[in-house]
Structures are given as C-alpha cells and as structure tokens.
Amino acid sequence: MPPVPVRRLLSVAVAGFSGLLGLGLIFGAYTAGPGVRVPFAVVVFGVQLLFVFAWTMAVRPPALPVVAAVAVVVAGAADAAAALPRIAALGPLGYVAAAGFVVGVLGQLVRRKDRARVTDSLGATLLIVVGVVAFASLVVLSRIPIGTQASHVCLAATAVALAVARLTDAVLPWPRMAPQVPRGAAGVVAG
C-alpha cells in the first residue's frame, strides 16, 4: 500500500476549524445566564449537527439515514432534557441516550436491506448517540454555579490542543506513525 500524502493545507484548515468551534462554544456558554439556557442549547445543537454529519460521513454506517435521523432526534431531545428541567442533572441525558439507542435498534430491525452489517450500524448509532448526549452535558454544566467556568477551561484547553496538534502536523508531519496515516508523531504528542 503506498503512503498517503500529507495534506498540509487540510491540517491548517482543521486547526482553524477546531479553534473557531472552541471559541463558538465558549462564547455560546456566555449567553447562558441563570434563567436563560435556550441560546446556549441552540449553539450546542448546531455543534451536535456538525458532529453527526462528520461522524456519519467518516464511519459510513450501512443504514446512514437511520443512524443520522436517530442522532439528530436524540440531539434535540438531549438539549431539551438538559435545558428544561428545574434542577440540573445528568440523569435525563442518560435516559435520552438509552431511548435513542433503543430507537436505533428498532430502526435497524424494520430495515430489510443490509441486515448483514447490522452490528456495524448499531455500533455507529451508539457512538454518535453518546457523542451528541455528551455535548448536551455542556448545557447541564452551564446551569451549575461554577460549571460555566469549568466548561470554559475545558473547552479552551481542547481547542488549543487540537489547533496545536494540527498546526504541528502542517509544519512537522514526521516521523510518520504509519504510511497510511497522514499525521506525524510530533503533532500527536504536541497536541
């Protein structure tokens, strides 16, 4: 198998996107006040849609429409479960994740095509459902008095780490971890 070429501009674009995404989430968290949670939930829902799109395109599950539809519905339900209750808790998010997985299983059972790869599709559904529910936990965290500050620190650290890793890949894409991976070990370690 020939080595995959290093795409430096793609690494720079991913670094810029991760930085902008981190800034968007940080500034979105500022919109959440003591009684105002919906604006931040809308920002998080936008990020969840990007997450669903990126992962369904990367994983390419056999039942892509079912997986994507379940994930988008779970994202909306998770945001509602995070923003609407009077007391901030993670319990409702767990129920939403479990219900989303059950709906994903039922969606797979009614399909006749591609049942041979049902475990791949269920694995992708579980991965994406847990991911969108994890993003909704930011809304729950913003409802706790010190949670907003904690989320700012975590989001800033994540955005900086991703940007540094990808910018390092653009400048120093070596030593290669494997010929099929267009990233260098320096970027993985620096990030």
Which residues make up each language-model segment?
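N-terminal signal-anchor module of multipass membrane proteins
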Residues: 1-49
